[in-house]
Every structure is written in C-alpha cells, then in structure tokens.
C-alpha cells in the first residue's frame, strides 16, 4: 500500500515536471500568427458549412420526391 502511494506521488512529480518544461517552451503568438490561425479556422468552418449545404439541398429534394407531403387533417 505504501509503495502504491509513493508510486502515485512519483507519477505526479513527473507530470508536474513535464508540464513545467512545456510551460517554459510556450510563447504568446504574434498578431500575424494569430490572424493566420483565425483565417484558416474561418476558412475551414466555411468549407464545412458549404459542404453541409451542398449535401442538405439534394437530400431535402430527394426526400420530397420519395415521400409526398401529407394533407392536413381538418
């Protein structure tokens, strides 16, 4: 039981040391880097939206052909 606790403590220490190393390497992005990432992200989201719309329109049209609209009950 004592060794399990010591092992967990060692794992925690190693994790904290790895986090510290990563933190020391990190740097704040420049304005140009930030804008480049924002542009690529916006382009990707737009592309996914366009692809979704291209799939949605024919699917809706085909759905309308295969299943005629029902008449409302009075």
From Swiss-Prot:
Keywords: Cell membrane, Membrane, Protein transport, Translocation, Transmembrane, Transmembrane helix, Transport. GO terms for biological process: intracellular protein transmembrane transport; protein secretion; protein targeting. The keyword Nucleotide-binding does not apply. Residues 1-36 are cytoplasmic. Pfam families: SecE. One of its GO terms (cellular component) is plasma membrane. InterPro entries: Prot_translocase_SecE_dom_sf, Translocase_Sec61-g, Translocase_SecE/Sec61-g. Gene3D superfamilies: Preprotein translocase SecE subunit. Residues 63-74 are extracellular. The keyword Cytoplasm does not apply. It is found in: Cell membrane. Disulfide bonds: none annotated. Essential subunit of the protein translocation channel SecYEG. Clamps together the 2 halves of SecY. May contact the channel plug during translocation. HAMAP family: SecE. Component of the Sec protein translocase complex. Heterotrimer consisting of alpha (SecY), beta (SecG) and gamma (SecE) subunits. The heterotrimers can form oligomers, although 1 heterotrimer is thought to be able to translocate proteins. Interacts with the ribosome. May interact with SecDF, and other proteins may be involved. This is Protein translocase subunit SecE. The gene is secE.
